[in-house]
């Protein structure tokens, strides 16, 4: 006793219709990180003019995973209480969002370690905008590869 052709086609259609290609892009972690970045950059975050390592400038041999690893290393500066800059000490809401961002970006990272060159610096504002741009590109790429 096998499947009738009609039943096999119906089951196949159900299988296809539940895929992401039909329902649109659903990369929750990336979408949540981008939303958090939007909130942090829209709020007029304190310390936006402070300097952080410019780790998001890709060289020819830099992979996307390496950029994300470096970004997570920079964001760790806001995670541990001993490293928090004075301008964020009393801004628990913004600090919470930056910590959430650190956890999210670290979760995207598949590399165990990466080097951060601290010889070139950028403002926190420019760093967050660059990170947002990279992650939006990654999000769009993940959406188009599903369809």
Swiss-Prot record:
Cystine residue pairs: 47-87
Source superkingdom: Eukaryota
Major location category of this protein: secreted
Subcellular locations according to the entry: Secreted
Signal peptide: 1-24
Biological-process GO terms, alphabetical: activated T cell proliferation; B cell activation; B cell costimulation; B cell proliferation; cell surface receptor signaling pathway via JAK-STAT; cellular response to mercury ion; cholesterol metabolic process; defense response to protozoan
Function field: Participates in at least several B-cell activation processes as well as of other cell types. It is a costimulator of DNA-synthesis. It induces the expression of class II MHC molecules on resting B-cells. It enhances both secretion and cell surface expression of IgE and IgG1. It also regulates the expression of the low affinity Fc receptor for IgE (CD23) on both lymphocytes and monocytes. Positively regulates IL31RA expression in macrophages. Stimulates autophagy in dendritic cells by interfering with mTORC1 signaling and through the induction of RUFY4.
UniProt protein name: Interleukin-4
The species this protein was found in: Rattus norvegicus
Gene field: Il4
């Amino acid at each position: 006793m096998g499947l009738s052709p009609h039943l096999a086609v119906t089951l196949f259609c159900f299988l296809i219709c539940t895929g992401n290609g039909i329902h649109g892009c659903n990369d929750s972690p990336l979408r949540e990180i981008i939303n958090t970045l939007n909130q942090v950059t829209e709020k007029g975050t304190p310390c936006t003019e402070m300097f952080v390592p410019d780790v998001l400038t890709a060289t020819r041999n830099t992979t996307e995973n390496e950029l994300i690893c470096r970004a997570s290393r920079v964001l760790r500066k806001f995670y541990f209480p001993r490293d928090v800059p004075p301008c964020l000490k009393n801004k628990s809401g913004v600090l919470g969002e930056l910590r959430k961002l650190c956890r999210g970006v670290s979760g995207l990272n598949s590399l165990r370690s990466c080097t951060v060159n601290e010889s070139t610096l950028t403002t926190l504002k420019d760093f967050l905008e660059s990170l947002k741009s990279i992650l939006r590109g990654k999000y769009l790429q993940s959406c188009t590869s599903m369809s």
